[in-house]
Each structure stands twice: as structure tokens, then as C-alpha cells.
């Protein structure tokens, strides 16, 4: 698969849209970023693997549960995306910087990497797999 500049931009926008949707707690927008058979997994500070949680509904349940436990305002900043096309999918590694604001104070919570696999789904790039690798717990 050859990846055009337009595809790279669309995939970068997908990752930004997913972060924005989570931060704004816009569940319909977040869900629209995911393939039906999407999956998510996590590892914090080299610890045990959590997940994968398979299927869009399971992935959305992970997001909803996380949101319910948070009383602050989150800002997920995605940067430095690198793309590796393979067959009908694209692997994307990007940096994650996570900030939180509460009571007028903003703090850096953690940094890490997103390891995403995206694919075209009904003409739109969507997240098929997401592995979140955090450098530290928060």
C-alpha cells in the first residue's frame, strides 16, 4: 500500500479527533473514530499488559469507565506520528502527552506512546487497534 500525503493528513486528523472527542466527552464522535472490530490494550511503566478489550462496544466501555473516574479536564496531545503502511492497514506510532486541569491548576499527568493500526472503513480512516504505552502511572 502506498500512503499519500492526503492519507497521512487524514490519519493524523483521525488521531486528533479521537483525542478531542475523549477530552470533550463526546462519545458519539469518539465511537465514530473506531472500527466495529476495534481493540484496545494498555501497559503502564513496563508493567503487565491490560487487555486487549475487543470490539467497539468493549473499547467504548473502557473509555466510559475511565471518564467516570475523572473529575478533571483532560487534554490528550498527539504528536510526532510515524506511518508504516502494510497491506490494507497502516501502523501509526505517535507520542502522547497527557495534561489535566482541576481547580485552575494544570499538571502533566504522563507521557507515552500510542501504537495504532488504522484502516479505511466505508471510505473513512478509523482506529482498528490501539495499544497505549504509558511511561509512568498517574
What is the predicted function of each stretch?
Residues 68-138:
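A beta-strand edge to alpha-helix "cap/lid" segment located at domain peripheries
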Residues 23, 53, 110:
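Short glycine/serine/threonine-biased micro-segments
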Residues 1-36:
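Short, low-complexity N-terminal intrinsically disordered segments enriched in polar/charged residues
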